[in-house]
Regions:
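A short beta-strand-turn-helix
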Residues: 12-37
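Thiol/selenol-based redox catalytic cores and closely related redox-interacting motifs
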Residues: 97-166
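Structural microenvironment flanking redox-active thiols in thiol-disulfide oxidoreductases
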Residues: 53-104
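Loop/helix-junction capping segments adjacent to catalytic residues or to phosphate/diphosphate-binding pockets
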Residues: 47-48, 79, 165-168
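N-terminal targeting signals for export/organelle localization
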Residues: 1-20, 181-182
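Short active-site neighborhood of thiol/selenol oxidoreductases, capturing the structured segment around
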Residues: 28-58, 69, 73
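A generic fold-level signal
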Residues: 33-34, 65, 143
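A short, polar/charged loop-to-alpha-helix boundary motif
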Residues: 166-181
């Protein structure tokens, strides 16, 4: 379910130092810059839906030059992030969060059994497989849910709270959805 949040991101979060892939040295605030940014919290790298999300977002960004800047968050080290993104989106920017501190600060929760492995998730595997995605080696917290936040001027202006591990918005139409919510 997507709904606007309009919440201010605390200074302590914005001023937190970050490392990862394709980042400028500094803090989370340094990565956001001006304008709209899409913060995408991925599930573990072995998850078929993590791979689907990265692939779908890459296609949406390629199709729309005005697409919001995407900043991924992932549960691994910078080395793991480089290896994953080298294959799936070499130009992507991503924050390494092996301790899942940003996940917690943004309220990206852990899944229940049904949210992680329920019927809706199992049905969604066919969708991801039809796009050429498969599960890989598990890494990180396999129960951590995904999360997506549109951020502008240090405020969350829209958020997608997934109903289950495979739930994500239509990335191609996401800029229109965010614009309507603002």
């Amino acid at each position: 379910m997507a709904e606007p949040s309009q919440s201010q991101i605390p200074d302590a979060v914005l001023e937190s130092p970050v490392t990862g892939v394709g980042l400028v040295p500094g803090t989370l605030a340094d990565q956001l810059g001006e304008g709209l940014s899409l913060l995408v919290f991925l599930r573990h790298f072995g998850c078929i839906f993590c791979r689907e999300t990265v692939g779908d977002l890459r296609a949406a960004v390629a199709a729309d030059p005005s697409y919001p800047r995407v900043l991924f968050f992932y549960q691994g080290s910078p080395t793991e992030g480089r290896a994953f993104l080298r294959r799936d989106w070499p130009e992507a920017r991503a924050v390494a969060d092996p301790e899942q501190e940003f996940y917690e600060r943004f309220g990206v929760r852990r899944a229940s059994f049904l949210e992680g492995l329920g019927p809706a998730v199992l049905r969604s595997r066919a969708r991801a497989r039809a796009k050429g995605h498969e599960n890989g080696r598990r890494s990180g917290d396999v129960w951590r849910m995904p999360g997506i936040f549109a951020v502008e001027a240090e405020r969350v202006v829209w958020a997608h709270q997934p109903r289950h591990a495979a739930d994500h918005p239509d990335f191609a139409s996401l800029p229109v959805t965010i614009s309507a919510a603002r």
